[in-house]
């Protein structure tokens, strides 16, 4: 029908009228028909299935991806687009010259000398065209690379800015650190890829498509119209592929985020994981999360194969139609052979360009899906954004705070009411203490004052103004906060204190450090205030971190001070002086103090007793104790009784429970094992990493388990690639036949058309099989690499995790990016490489058979083509590593800021974080322009050589014909085949940047996989019938991250089997280092650590740790249920054993009071539980393990008085006949220990039982006891 219509139009209407008619018929009718057909297939009235919603909803428009382009970016994009369009249009222009040369070469039989002269002239025109291509391709690559980097940097900043301004409730229920790392590491990289080179490539191919058709219409419009009728079919195939791909990509991303969250959490709690030998369990959970990506990845491979196969199938069918229709055009004398042939070539190349644009369209589809959660977060409205626009700022702050009928439940648990119409008045300038049991709601008061949450009803007033109407940043600027678990950032001590006041002077910083009693330990550090504290302050002891946090609050000089167990992590000596400093700071300020230990709040102006979300008593210390039946008096008696039971000779209260953490500081809980490490900085001259050399053989050895998929995919890729030179051969054969008689032409064209139809079916089959095989192999590779990397990471010693490049955020980022890019290089790019390899091999075989002389000349030009791309590759290699490192540091900062979101919000540090983040992005942004310029120039040079070689080939072909060494037929066929080869080589070499990135990622992967942990069992000997004798003999020890700071020198310690040993002393004296050495988190530099008389270096590491139970000062829980967290102690335990452990740890009662009981999710790092609840779950976990050796690091520190008494009794029962090492600041908790060792400066300065040590009135133990006695009521 279409063919008849074309001839009818060509005979009765001029082109200007007939072309619009045909275009209308081509694009209206089929499209409408298809639309109706699709509508008919959709059942009316039925709600869309959930699966379809997932496919269609998570995407943004293509234009929205460019939301961050400014005027300079618009200029760059305009110039880059102009360059891409000129570059793309150059191929159709080349075929105009080529068509003229065909006619000239055809005249060579009649006028050989004139023909040679004219061929030389047109060959020179090819050189001029090559120069234009050089500059346009340079402009294309340089501009798009630079603007892509710029826009991605702005998107990263906007995403982090929005994330930091979110309501805190979002982080309790939806957002996680893993999700942020995934978005910044992976999703924005996907968007950046689409915004930079992919847009340039797309415009390049689309301009080639448009130019090809435009030139075709001006030459022989009938041929172009026939081809145009195929376009809707190609577009439909591409559209269906894109539609299905979006849903699959979104699902794969969701699975990757879940896996990333598991990895980030496990690495962050690596000490707990290794202590409980939970490495294999963590790997199993990680693998299970990745298995969904494997399932959806296989479907994505099938979809891609069918999509690309369908498009190429349609293209082959269109070539069959074109070859036949062109012969009819020539036969009817509508156009000559040369003109018809070049028109056909232009249209074919235009059609091919659509196929070549398919990967770019695929990149846009991925970018639209990846950008959806990014833009959703950026555009999400929050209280912070609203208050910045409409919130008021008070001219003066007196500090009067009032809770008026405040009702509140946490968004993550709306069915648990915390406050029901709470009324509380906090007078201006007064100190108000909140006391009560764990979980009573004390810390929630602080959360509401800080406006981390909004009350459901009622109001919180500041000086009579509802704080919900105030500017939230201004409000938080008036408040100073010290949390129970101090959140520090991975920078220097000075920078951490500056979070309190960004423009503080050196004198103000020093004064704050003096007031908080931090100046002494800071001055003892080799780098003083410039000491790096490590990720979340991991290089400092708990007491040191707390003092820096107090310094940060002091330097802020706030009108309102909120203290949540501010001195809980300090030793007795420091606590007294810090408490005195805080007493001075609190004068004249409205202060809210949350405390369990009543001795710290007896001087408060007002004490409010909180019980189950109600204020049950209110008054000062004297008034409250005057009521013997009151709640406060009961709490006081309970503490005194607990103290007297432990130590009747000293009438004091030494309990140190922390407050409830219902306000949930989302900081990474870390053990205090590193308490004596002063800095994470590497010693001078240390080599941070060794470059890993990766051979191609080793690279592909990673896919050896899937060799069957690889072989099958490779064969199909070869077949798919080899079809292109065969197509070129068929087309050139058609050209030659156009100059024969009509009968001969019909015979040849029929054969060629049938071959093309067969090729279309083969193409569909091989593309589908190829992408199914490579898709499956890619997902299996990604799963295997991620699993092996994760396992290898967890095998490393704890000292490795202390290094600045191995923080949890950075390692999670590497797992995310390295494996994905490895899949890209080994699988995605391999399909193109293998196809092009099949193409090149087939092309050269055919070309050498047809005309070896011409083939050799063309082959001689290839080194010039390749050299341009090699230069580009070498240049990119020089900068790739630095950029990857810069992004890793930026990702670490982003992850850290989100995990410490409450501290960031409380100190209004959002802008400071963004400034630091922008600083980390500065280097890649600066170098992007330079990289783009040089990469573009080298790319342009290689393109120049490719097109110049065409001119050389045609000139040499005419010379061979002139000398009678070749005929017209062989020259045309050879030239057509070699054109296809050159295009394929250009495409292959254009992959150099991607191959380079992949090579760097592979090196990064093998760097982790090949690293041998420095702590391994020298033999596989296991301990049986462990009684528990521990001995440290002649131990010398320094932390690997700071070898110049000696912790122990010739240290000796013996813990007898079944006995308890308590380690006491000031913060930083070496107590927690003993636990680290027993667990073999570190090895001594000299001396031995022995259990049962055996050097633990010679024992199997996991077997050793199975006999050791651990309860840390800061409990580390996992984002699963309470039941699963307790079960972590013994995976094979029964339900009754889990419940019994919880009962012994005094956790059963609060667990059963929760709506979901043991199935309650604890949240990321236990964020949904209070501090006391987290600690009891951790104790239950240790009880369930039933170890021979028990290590307690302030195990009851987070409990209220009543819970502590019961839990201490449970621990006493657990410690019976079990070797126990207890680390404690509060001496009341270790009175019953068989032996007490007093540590000072890494030495045991006194040792004995409590009864013996208190007799020595001048001894260090008695001094510590006396100091604590003075601090009690």
Swiss-Prot record:
Residues in the signal sequence: 1-30
Keyword Signal set for record: yes
SUPFAM superfamilies: ABC transporter transmembrane region, P-loop containing nucleoside triphosphate hydrolases
One protein family per Pfam: ABC_tran
Keywords, comma-separated and alphabetical: ATP-binding, Glycoprotein, Membrane, Nucleotide-binding, Repeat, Signal, Transmembrane, Transmembrane helix, Transport
Membrane-spanning segments: 66-86, 91-111, 126-146, 209-229, 230-250, 305-325, 345-365, 711-731, 752-772, 832-852, 934-954, 975-995
Family note: Belongs to the ABC transporter superfamily. ABCB family. Multidrug resistance exporter (TC 3.A.1.201) subfamily.
Name of the molecule in the record: ABC transporter B family member 2
């Amino acid at each position: 029908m279409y063919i008849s219509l074309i001839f009818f139009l060509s005979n009765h209407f001029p082109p200007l009228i007939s072309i619009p008619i045909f275009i209308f018929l081509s694009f209206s009718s089929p499209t409408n028909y298809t639309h109706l057909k699709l509508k008919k297939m959709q059942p009316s009235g039925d709600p869309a299935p959930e699966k379809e919603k997932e496919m269609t909803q998570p995407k943004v428009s293509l234009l929205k991806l460019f939301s961050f382009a400014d005027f300079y970016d618009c200029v760059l994009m305009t110039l880059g687009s102009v360059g891409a369009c000129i570059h793309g249009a150059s191929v159709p222009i080349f075929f105009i010259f080529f068509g003229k040369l065909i006619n000239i070469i055809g005249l060579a039989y009649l006028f050989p000398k004139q023909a040679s002269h004219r061929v030389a002239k047109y060959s020179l025109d090819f050189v001029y065209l090559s120069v234009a291509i050089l500059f346009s391709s340079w402009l294309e690559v340089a501009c798009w690379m630079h603007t892509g980097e710029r826009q991605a940097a702005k998107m990263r900043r906007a995403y982090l800015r929005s994330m930091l301004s979110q309501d805190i409730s979002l982080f309790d229920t939806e957002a996680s650190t893993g999700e942020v790392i995934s978005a910044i590491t992976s999703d924005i990289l996907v968007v950046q890829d689409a915004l930079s080179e992919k847009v340039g490539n797309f415009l390049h191919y689309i301009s080639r498509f448009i130019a090809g058709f435009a030139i075709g219409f001006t030459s022989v419009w009938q041929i172009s119209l026939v081809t145009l009728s195929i376009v809707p079919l190609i577009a439909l195939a591409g559209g269906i592929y894109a539609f299905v791909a979006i849903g699959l990509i979104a699902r794969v991303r969701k699975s990757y985020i879940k896996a990333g969250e598991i990895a980030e959490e496990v690495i962050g709690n690596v000490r707990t994981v290794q202590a409980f030998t939970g490495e294999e369990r963590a790997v199993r959970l990680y693998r299970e999360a990745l298995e969904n990506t494997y399932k959806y990845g296989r479907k994505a491979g099938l979809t891609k194969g069918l999509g690309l196969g369908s498009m190429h199938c349609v293209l082959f069918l269109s070539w069959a139609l074109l070859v036949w229709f062109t012969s009819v055009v020539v036969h009817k004398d509508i156009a000559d052979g040369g003109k018809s042939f070049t028109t056909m070539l232009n249209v074919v190349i235009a059609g091919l360009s659509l196929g070549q644009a398919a990967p770019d369209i695929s990149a846009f589809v991925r970018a639209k899906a990846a950008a959806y959660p990014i833009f959703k977060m950026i555009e999400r409205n929050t209280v912070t954004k609203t208050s910045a626009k409409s919130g008021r700022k008070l001219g003066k702050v007196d500090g009067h705070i009032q809770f008026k009928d405040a009702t509140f439940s946490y968004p993550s648990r709306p069915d648990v009411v915390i406050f029901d119409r709470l009324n509380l008045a906090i007078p201006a300038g007064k100190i108000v203490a909140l006391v009560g049991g764990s979980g009573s709601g004390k810390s929630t008061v602080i959360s509401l004052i800080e406006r981390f949450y909004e009350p459901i009803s009622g109001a919180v007033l500041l000086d009579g103004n509802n704080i919900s109407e105030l500017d939230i940043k201004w409000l938080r600027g008036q408040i100073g906060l010290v949390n129970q678990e101090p959140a520090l950032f991975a920078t220097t001590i000075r920078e951490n204190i500056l979070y309190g006041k960004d423009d503080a002077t050196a004198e103000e910083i020093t004064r704050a450090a003096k007031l908080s009693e931090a100046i002494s330990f800071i001055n003892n550090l080799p780098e003083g205030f410039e000491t790096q504290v490590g990720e979340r302050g991991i290089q400092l002891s708990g007491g040191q971190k707390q003092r820096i946090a107090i310094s940060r609050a002091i330097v802020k000089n706030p009108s309102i001070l909120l203290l949540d167990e501010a001195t809980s992590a300090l030793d007795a000596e420091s606590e007294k002086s810090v408490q005195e400093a805080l007493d001075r700071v609190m004068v004249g300020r409205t202060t809210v103090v949350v405390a369990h230990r009543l001795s710290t709040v007896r001087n408060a102006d007002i004490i409010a007793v909180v019980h189950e979300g109600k204020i049950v008593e209110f008054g000062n210390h004297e008034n409250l104790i005057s009521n013997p039946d009151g709640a406060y008096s009961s709490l006081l008696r309970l503490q005194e009784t607990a103290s007297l039971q432990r130590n009747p000779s000293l009438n004091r209260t030494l309990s140190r429970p922390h407050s409830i953490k219902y306000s949930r500081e989302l900081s990474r809980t870390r053990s205090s094992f590193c308490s004596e490490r002063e800095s994470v900085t590497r010693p001078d001259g240390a080599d941070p990493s060794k470059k890993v050399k990766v051979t191609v053989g080793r690279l592909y050895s990673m896919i050896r388990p899937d060799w069957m998929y690889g072989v099958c995919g490779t064969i199909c890729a070869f077949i798919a690639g080899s079809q292109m030179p065969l197509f070129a051969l068929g087309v050139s054969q058609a050209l030659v036949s156009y100059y024969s008689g009509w009968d001969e032409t019909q015979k040849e064209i029929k054969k060629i058309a049938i071959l093309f139809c067969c090729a279309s079916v083969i193409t569909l089959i091989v593309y589908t099989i190829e992408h199914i095989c490579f898709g499956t192999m890619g997902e299996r590779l990604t799963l295997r690499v991620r699993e092996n990397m994760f396992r290898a990471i967890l095998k490393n010693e704890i000292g490795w995790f202390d290094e600045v490049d191995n923080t949890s955020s950075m390692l999670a980022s590497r797992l995310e990016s390295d494996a994905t890019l490895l899949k890209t290089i080994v699988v995605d790019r391999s399909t193109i490489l293998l196809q092009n390899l099949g193409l090149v091999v087939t092309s050269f075989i055919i070309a050498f058979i047809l005309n070896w002389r011409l083939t050799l000349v063309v082959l001689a030009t290839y080194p010039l083509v390749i050299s341009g791309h090699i230069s580009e590759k070498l240049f990119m290699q020089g900068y790739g590593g630095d950029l990857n490192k810069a992004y890793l540091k930026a990702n670490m900062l982003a992850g850290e800021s989100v995990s410490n979101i409450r501290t960031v919000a409380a100190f209004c540090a959002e802008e400071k974080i963004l400034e630091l983040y922008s600083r980390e992005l500065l280097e890649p942004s600066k170098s992007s322009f330079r990289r783009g310029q040089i990469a573009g120039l080298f790319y342009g040079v290689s393109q120049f050589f490719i097109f110049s070689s065409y001119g050389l080939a045609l000139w040499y072909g005419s010379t061979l014909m002139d000398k009678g060494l070749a005929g017209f037929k062989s020259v045309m066929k050879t030239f057509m085949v070699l054109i296809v080869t050159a295009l394929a080589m250009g495409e292959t070499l254009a992959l150099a940047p991607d191959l380079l990135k992949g090579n760097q990622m592979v090196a990064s992967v093998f760097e982790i996989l090949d690293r041998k942990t420095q702590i391994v069992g020298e033999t596989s000997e296991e301990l049986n019938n462990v009684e528990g004798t521990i001995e440290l003999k002649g131990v010398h020890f320094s932390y690997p991250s700071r070898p110049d700071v000696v912790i122990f020198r010739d240290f000796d310690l013996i813990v007898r089997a079944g006995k308890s040993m308590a380690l006491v002393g000031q913060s930083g004296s070496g107590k927690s280092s003993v636990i680290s050495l027993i667990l073999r988190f570190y090895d001594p530099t000299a001396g031995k650590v022995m259990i049962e008389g055996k050097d633990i270096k010679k024992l199997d590491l996991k077997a050793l740790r199975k006999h050791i139970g651990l309860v840390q000062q800061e409990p580390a829980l996992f984002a699963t249920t309470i039941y699963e967290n307790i079960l972590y102690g013994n995976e094979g335990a029964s339900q009754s054993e889990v419940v019994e452990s919880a009962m012994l740890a005094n956790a059963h009662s609060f667990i059963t009071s929760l709506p979901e009981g043991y199935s309650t999710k604890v949240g990321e790092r236990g964020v949904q539980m209070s501090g006391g609840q987290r600690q009891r779950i951790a104790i239950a976990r240790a009880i369930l393990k039933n170890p021979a050796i028990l290590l307690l690091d302030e195990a009851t520190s987070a409990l209220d008085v009543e819970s502590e008494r019961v839990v201490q009794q449970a621990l006493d029962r657990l410690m019976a006949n079990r070797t126990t090492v207890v680390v404690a600041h509060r001496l009341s908790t270790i009175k019953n220990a068989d032996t007490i060792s007093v540590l000072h400066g890494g030495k045991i300065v006194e040792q004995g039982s409590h009864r013996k040590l208190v007799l020595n009135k001048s001894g260090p133990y008695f001094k510590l006891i006396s100091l604590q006695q003075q601090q009690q009521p």
